[in-house]
Amino acid sequence: MNYMVRDPLRLTTDALLHASGVDGVFARTAVFERVVDGLNVLISRHRAPETEVLRFPPVMSRAHIQKSGYLGSFPNLLGAVCCLHGSESDIRGAVEGDKAKGGWVGALDATDLVLTPAACYPLYPLVAKRGRVPQAGLLFDVASDCFRHEPSAQIDRFQTFRMREFVRIGTPDQVVAFRADWMTRAPEIADLLGLSYKTETASDPFFGRAGKLMAINQVEQSLKFELLIPVRSAQQPTACMSFNYHRDHFGKTWDIKTWDIKTRDIKTSDVKSADPQSEAGALAHTGCVAFGIDRLTLALFAAHGLDLRTWPASARDALAL
């Protein structure tokens, strides 16, 4: 499916988004949000019946993000919640302090909160508290307002954005099958919405020289794919969905283990004679399909224009416009 990509920067800034004075942070108009709502309903229709739905706030535990390994991979993207601490005189002094020394900004101290960088990060410690993953595995629908410190004038790169994910937790076979299924279903959704796309292997923006090696390994092992859709240009399409296989990273980090046939029926009297590896359980594997809600919305307007009434019938029906 081919179409001419219109000027998305002018399109979005003039009619859909209002600049805040900070790159990548926008106020969104009613017509933009109408499409966002339609997308969320469409995504929900593709949710499996056994899926547990969780909605997370835009902040999460600093201790949890440290334990997850995020700082080792993306320290430059993390945003921390900071506040003024101390007595009334301390805080007043900071507010009225010497601007040459940084003023109140220089007096800020970190709290125990950070801005959520991806919708699935708050999920894993919750799952870990529940004990063994059942034999059938687990499915979650999670969403959050997320933040990544990537200031840019490019209209398709928000610093604060909405992410929706379906997360699969279970055995390697279960997670691989889940991702393969979604790599078939996601293009069907794009076709329904009248969007051009291509799917390619990809890597996360790991930090530093060591990060370059991590990115190479991620591509070589086909751990991440992205569905790319023209927003700014057809030559440089934008990643609007991703299909990720984390292997046992989060299982190992949070000690999430499966409860398979070998372990589920072990009686207390049989523990000593049971196979140690079976009793210990296998580390759970995880994977997710992530939807960039704001990017998908921008892609739709870039493809079909501002007037929702002129959009393809299949897209209008799918989004209930």
Q: PLM features: what roles do these ranges have?
A:
Residues N2-L321:
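TRNA-recognition modules of translation machinery and tRNA-sensing kinases, especially anticodon-binding
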